[in-house]
């Protein structure tokens, strides 16, 4: 049922994973179990082999070759990448180590912090509340939390769930992210929401948020009576079969197969500590996951599991809401035309393709994922190092699709 093709090189193995059409009726958990049973044979880690060769299908050979070579040049400690379609995992590979100066290899089950890619789960959670008539996109935040003040009182009374999820609250961008950097947790920062400067009317301009965006967690808890982490686990992770995915620092620290964050110190990657404050804004930055589970997540957003996320549901979540200005790294990609934020996702036009995307970065970790619904193809990358190389991964992948 599953075919594997291995490299003939003795120093390193690559594998292309293929599922036959007869597996289409299986639930994602059963597919994942099958992958787990075969992962030792299917997904061995790369060695430090500068003469990397791939037996991938030609569509991805050049991209994967570039990625491995660039990662070697940057001496990235550990990484994982997957290329998927709606129907299958086309390619999945890990390489390197979970922590510098150890022999602990990154495996397909190794868990990374995915940082701001967590926002895609928050947008989906908000959409589930709306789909179940527990909330509406146009509900005012002050109707849910009467004492809440976000910025000035006039604008605060107009901010909706849609504005929160689409980063269009009109509040100063990155409000209080500096406090997260300093280790101040969400519960304390919320007390200062009324002090946030308002820069435009809600819905009129883009302003990326971590702290304010995390009000989605409060809304989930108020609407369902469940903690945000439990809701995501029960309504997203478990139904999709994402068995290594968790929310929060405690869950991360309970696992043994986790990756360690790394930062550059005088040109060398050194292990560092996790910043617990960013876990306190769980909707913005609190998800942990392996490459196996992130491959499932991209497939789900390509429409692999319509009984969980229907085409209409995905269309809503991936719909552009507010245009994003130039200035961020993704806006400087050469072939990018227009860029928007949707409901927890970025959407942009790239060389004639509509791409759905999000990246992530938190102390010692970088991540990127992007997919093209029209071409039924997507990619996700996880680094246990805060490397700027991640900035180039999505355009390299997309440029390769057009060759």
How should these model regions be labeled?
Residues 2-9, 14, 18-109, 128-136, ...:
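N-terminal leader/targeting segments and the immediately adjacent pre-domain N-terminus
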Residues 46-93, 221-234, 238, 272-403:
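Catalytic loop of the DD-peptidase/beta-lactamase superfamily, centered on the K-T-G motif
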Residues 50-56, 111-113, 149-152, 176-180, ...:
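Second-shell loop/turn segments in exported
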Residues 62, 78, 102, 113-117, ...:
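Active-site helix/loop module of the DD-peptidase/beta-lactamase fold
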Residues 116-117, 207-210:
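Catalytic nucleophile serine of serine hydrolases
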Residues 120-125, 214-215, 291-296:
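Short amphipathic alpha-helical face segments that pack within enzyme cores
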Residues 160, 211-212:
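Mid-domain, small-residue-enriched loop/turn segments at the edges of structured enzyme/sensor domains
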Residues 187-199, 265-280:
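The feature captures the short pre-catalytic strand/loop hairpin that immediately precedes
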